[in-house]
Amino acid sequence: MIKKIVSISVCFLLIFLCGCSQESKFGVQQFVERMNSQYGTDFATADFILGTDETKESYLFCEKDEMLISLSLDTNNTIRGVGLLLTESMDINDGLNTFLHICCVFTGESEENQRATLTNCQITAEKIKYADSNFVITVGKFKYSVICNNYSVTLFCDRT
């Protein structure tokens, strides 16, 4: 009887853990669905996703005419990296907030943990400026890259 109870408990625990875990690798459609559901935004419409060629290596989304979000894909059409390009007219804080959100969806981290990671990588409004600078930092399974000049700021997060 005890063996039966233990085995049933283990089954329920496995089902619960599998149901709560977030898939670590996913495609564009899943990324967009997560972005829209987690942040209540219309990151991209279903029509855009359905009308996009699935064999592309990257997808680009414009937001507010000043920000370009890119998703880089591997040969299996799973996302291997996310990027954000800001023009000089874009507020750095707004851009970093959007980068935080796309990194949360991409890495599966909570907003609090991802914000701490970006802060530890010095990807903050105090450090990121429209001036010549660049750096790359690897944290766990992800590499964060920042490229800045007088006209734009480019932020990347890739799987290592």
Language model segments and positions:
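Positively charged n-region of N-terminal signal peptides that target proteins for export
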Residues: M1-I5
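Repetitive helical segments and hydrophobic/amphipathic motifs
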Residues: F12-L13
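C-terminal motif of bacterial Sec signal peptides marking the signal peptidase cleavage site
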Residues: F16-G19
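Bacterial signal peptide processing site
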Residues: S21-E23
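Intrinsically disordered, low-complexity regions enriched in acidic/Ser/Thr/Pro/Gln residues
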Residues: G27-F43
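Short glycine-rich, low-complexity/disordered patches
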Residues: T41-K56, G108-V139
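Amphipathic N-proximal alpha-helical interface segments
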Residues: D53-L96, A131-T160
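Long, charged/polar, surface-exposed segments that mediate recognition or autoinhibition
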Residues: L73-A125
